[in-house]
Amino acid sequence: MSWHPQYRSSKFRHVYGKPASKENCYDSVPITRSVHDNHFCAVNPHFIAVVTECAGGGAFLVIPLHQTGKLDPHYPKVCGHRGNVLDIKWNPFNDFEIASCSEDATIKIWNIPKQLLTRNLTTYRKELIGHARRVGLVEWHPTTANILFSAGYDYKVMVWNLDTKDSVIAGPVKTINCHQDVILSMSFNTNGSLLATTCKDRKIRIVDPRLGIVLQEASYKGHRANKVLFLGSLKKLLSTGTSRWNNRQMALWDQENLSVPLTEEDLDGSSGVLFPFFDSDTSMLYIVGKGDGNIRYYEVSMEKPHLTYLTEYRSYNPQKGIGIMPKRGLDVSSCEIFRFYKLITTKSLIEPVSMIVPRRSESYQEDIYPPTAAAQPSLTAHEWLSGMNRGPIMMSLRPGSELLDSQTLPPERPLSNSMVQVSPQPLEPMKQPAEDGDQAPFSLLEEKLAKWTAEHHLGEKSCLTNGFDVFECSPPKTENELLQMFYRQQEEIRRLRELLIQREVQTKQLELEIKNLRMALGQL
């Protein structure tokens, strides 16, 4: 076991886990008894989906997020697979579309109605047929619409293009055939240009998902990898598995060199799989153990020692699977930075656990909520398949704010209600470079900035405080006058703070629009 320093300066040093109360949990949920090492749970701001037991085939439940408490024993299921469901994933760009894979060697795409299900949903939108054996994993592309990856027990990863009217897709657009055994996990980097996998041969591979060639391969004997995860834009990988002495272990890798890990850490001697989760906004890493109730969390940095242990959430209720809420579904008013949904089979319970940063102020905490990935794709399927790469579109989590990184792309689907609204007066999309040195888009921004400055009278100076001229009035003579002036100044300070926050957000939006235009000009 590695030694952890007792103190470290970090704004996340005192993050703690807060389990939901009994009435805010999901009770009497028939959770699957499958022995596969998958999450079995998928969450978005509208629904929680969980794989369940079903006679005569595979099924999963889709429960509205607000419908907590005891579940009706006859609650409708999503069923249509002929074998057990092994994995489910929500479309990151459509909160009402979910993919499922099964032992029947098929993948199905489902449209979930916005209203509450009243009977079993058996009609799927698309069926993907191509694997020769059962399909164990599905993964949506992180920035591209309608691109889905699947991994089967035929040792193949298949790339599917769903941008078609066909209800049955009889073959993938690409098959990655570089594994010698069953694929255990898949993970994309930030822009989806690289795919990392772990295999039953305990090797980590970094694959070009379009060409299907192996770019890097780890054959380090001291670490038998089970799960792998890209760590955002840090150009690092995190894998969990076992050491030579069968201790549960995690290892950090440089994605450019997988010969030897940057660091290794033995955790304990339990046998359950370790599920890693990374929050690229806060650079926090969470390690969740299957079969125990603990959640360890670390802070990741570019400098040594790279991984800094923070603390651990402990619980007596062991989790069989785990789901996580996307950042856009968190409660920013309570300084929530991550949320887990633990599947507790011993109690037929789904328990939300919120990771909270303790803050005294109730205002929006800008430092712990940087811009995060929005529910809008930055590429179409055709663009990605033709070789384009682009990072995710960003949004602010501040209530009532706009998309910060709005690319000039046609929207693939309407935004969900939980997402922030786009400004009613966006910049005009650029179809070709301007003739006068490509300066036309910047002139639009200059006009917009000038108009905004004029509307807010930034060039004027005022000495009035709530109609009270501080330079013309004599100093207060009585205690009552002093109190009146004090309260007026307090109210003015509060109003100015709110105005300053609004202007900072608007300034950041304008800066990001300029950045986006420059990037777009560079691609033309």
Curated annotation (Swiss-Prot):
<dbReference type="InterPro" id="IPR036322">
    <property type="entry name" value="WD40_repeat_dom_sf"/>
</dbReference>
<dbReference type="InterPro" id="IPR001680">
    <property type="entry name" value="WD40_rpt"/>
</dbReference>
<feature type="repeat" description="WD 5">
    <location>
        <begin position="269"/>
        <end position="308"/>
    </location>
</feature>
<feature type="repeat" description="WD 4">
    <location>
        <begin position="220"/>
        <end position="263"/>
    </location>
</feature>
<protein>
    <recommendedName>
        <fullName>Coronin-2A</fullName>
    </recommendedName>
</protein>
<dbReference type="InterPro" id="IPR015505">
    <property type="entry name" value="Coronin"/>
</dbReference>
<dbReference type="Pfam" id="PF08953">
    <property type="entry name" value="DUF1899"/>
</dbReference>
<comment type="similarity">
    <text>Belongs to the WD repeat coronin family.</text>
</comment>
<feature type="repeat" description="WD 1">
    <location>
        <begin position="80"/>
        <end position="120"/>
    </location>
</feature>
<dbReference type="InterPro" id="IPR015048">
    <property type="entry name" value="DUF1899"/>
</dbReference>
<comment type="subunit">
    <text>Binds actin. Component of the N-Cor repressor complex, at least composed of NCOR1, NCOR2, HDAC3, TBL1X, TBL1R, CORO2A and GPS2.</text>
</comment>
<keyword id="KW-0853">WD repeat</keyword>
<dbReference type="Pfam" id="PF16300">
    <property type="entry name" value="WD40_4"/>
</dbReference>
<dbReference type="InterPro" id="IPR019775">
    <property type="entry name" value="WD40_repeat_CS"/>
</dbReference>
<keyword id="KW-0175">Coiled coil</keyword>
<feature type="coiled-coil region">
    <location>
        <begin position="484"/>
        <end position="523"/>
    </location>
</feature>
<keyword id="KW-0677">Repeat</keyword>
<feature type="region of interest" description="Disordered">
    <location>
        <begin position="403"/>
        <end position="436"/>
    </location>
</feature>
<dbReference type="GO" id="GO:0005903">
    <property type="term" value="C:brush border"/>
</dbReference>
<dbReference type="Pfam" id="PF00400">
    <property type="entry name" value="WD40"/>
</dbReference>
<feature type="repeat" description="WD 2">
    <location>
        <begin position="130"/>
        <end position="170"/>
    </location>
</feature>
<feature type="compositionally biased region" description="Polar residues">
    <location>
        <begin position="404"/>
        <end position="424"/>
    </location>
</feature>
<dbReference type="GO" id="GO:0003779">
    <property type="term" value="F:actin binding"/>
</dbReference>
<dbReference type="InterPro" id="IPR015943">
    <property type="entry name" value="WD40/YVTN_repeat-like_dom_sf"/>
</dbReference>
<dbReference type="GO" id="GO:0017053">
    <property type="term" value="C:transcription repressor complex"/>
</dbReference>
<keyword id="KW-0009">Actin-binding</keyword>
<feature type="repeat" description="WD 3">
    <location>
        <begin position="178"/>
        <end position="217"/>
    </location>
</feature>
